[in-house]
Amino acid sequence: MGRVTAPAPLEIEKTESAEEVFAVPEPDVPWVTIVHNDPVNLMSYVTYVFQTYFGYSKDKATKLMLDVHHKGRAVVSSGTREEMERDVQAMHGYGLWATLQQDRK
């Protein structure tokens, strides 16, 4: 039988670690609820929802609604992930488009 040779092992350059590829939630960073603009809900209704659910004054609710309308989105609350999940579900219940994310400024 002849001599069998194996190719030399390749050196693989380390690129990104799993932490760099996947954003890992940081426990000290608060979460926020973001309401996005939609073509369905009236501005007066969005203001009403912010006043009713969050207890915001008419002025604050109107400012947030105008941010949603003109900027396309507004941060309407912040806190723990569980609290923000509850707020997002409530906004969905009112028919608003809302998401949550960590506030990584």
UniProtKB/Swiss-Prot annotation:
GO BP annotation list: protein catabolic process; proteolysis
Record InterPro entries: ClpS, ClpS_core, Ribosomal_bL12_C/ClpS-like
Transmembrane segments: none
Biological role stated in the UniProt entry: Involved in the modulation of the specificity of the ClpAP-mediated ATP-dependent protein degradation.
Description of how the protein assembles with itself and partners: Binds to the N-terminal domain of the chaperone ClpA.
Family: Belongs to the ClpS family.
PANTHER family per record: ATP-DEPENDENT CLP PROTEASE ADAPTER PROTEIN CLPS, ATP-DEPENDENT CLP PROTEASE ADAPTER PROTEIN CLPS1, CHLOROPLASTIC
Name this protein carries in UniProt: ATP-dependent Clp protease adapter protein ClpS
Organism, scientific name: Streptomyces avermitilis (strain ATCC 31267 / DSM 46492 / JCM 5070 / NBRC 14893 / NCIMB 12804 / NRRL 8165 / MA-4680)
Source taxonomy: Bacteria, Bacillati, Actinomycetota, Actinomycetes, Kitasatosporales
Gene field: clpS
